[in-house]
């Protein structure tokens, strides 16, 4: 691993979205090349949600891995939700919405998401998102249209504890393959509905399989006194292409 050091650098956007609305890979991607260029494995990035501590693991011949602390803990926004309308917007039966004691709910760790539990992986794979129906039933949270984060327990891959899909018509995104902000929001729902005991809880979330762009988000939740004391998300970053932009 590269020598330990620290760095405070303003985050750089890689897409035309507000800086707060970024996925795990959009924080991982700048962090990994910066770490390689500067030979550091620990840096702090200035984001709109606050300073974000990011640790990077660099190993020759392996995909680089980046992990960062959540600057904000996930909080629930209590509001009435139209379960039938949600099912219609996802092209699912109302009986396919929810599993165990998980029900649709709104959570945010800086970006609001309407988290929608579905019965199983098959139901998640059958989702056909209708943005027009969604915009009719989805609530506004902090002045923003909540995005849809569909999740279920288990996964296609045996290492995954949850399978997820994210749709954000309000941001011009049909579907996203790896959404760190949504995984951050999900941490609160998991602690709430699964009643996590005190201790450390590592959780693997698979996303993007339906798009042919499989991603694995590592979510770590530390619980103390029945509440989240700390949470981290991370994953691997693989260079697929590179280029330069002249301004």
Predicted regions and their residues:
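Active-site proximal loop and beta-alpha junction motif in alpha/beta enzyme cores
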Residues: 1-18, 23-247
């Amino acid at each position: 691993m590269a020598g330990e050091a620290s760095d405070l650098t303003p985050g750089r956007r890689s897409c035309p979205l507000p800086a707060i609305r970024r996925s795990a890979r959009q924080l991982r991607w700048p962090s990994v090349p910066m770490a390689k260029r500067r030979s550091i494995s620990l840096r702090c990035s200035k984001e709109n949600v606050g300073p974000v501590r990011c640790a990077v693991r660099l190993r020759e011949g392996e995909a680089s891995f980046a992990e960062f602390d959540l600057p904000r803990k996930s909080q629930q926004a209590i509001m009435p939700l139209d379960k039938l309308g949600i099912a219609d917007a996802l092209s699912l039966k109302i009986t396919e919405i929810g599993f165990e004691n998980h029900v649709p709910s709104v959570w945010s760790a800086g970006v609001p998401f309407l988290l929608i539990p579905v019965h199983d992986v098959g139901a998640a794979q059958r989702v056909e998102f209708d943005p027009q129906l969604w915009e009719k039933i989805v609530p506004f949270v902090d002045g923003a249209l909540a995005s849809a984060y569909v999740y279920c327990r288990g996964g296609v891959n045996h290492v995954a504890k949850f399978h997820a899909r994210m749709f954000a018509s309000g941001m011009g995104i049909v579907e996203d393959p790896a959404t760190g902000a949504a995984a951050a929001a999900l941490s609160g729902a998991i602690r709430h509905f699964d009643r996590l005991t005190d201790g450390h809880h590592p959780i693997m979330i698979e996303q993007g399989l339906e798009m042919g762009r499989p991603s694995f988000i590592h979510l770590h939740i530390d619980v103390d006194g029945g509440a989240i004391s700390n949470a981290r998300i991370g994953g691997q970053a693989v260079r697929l292409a590179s280029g330069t932009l002249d301004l």
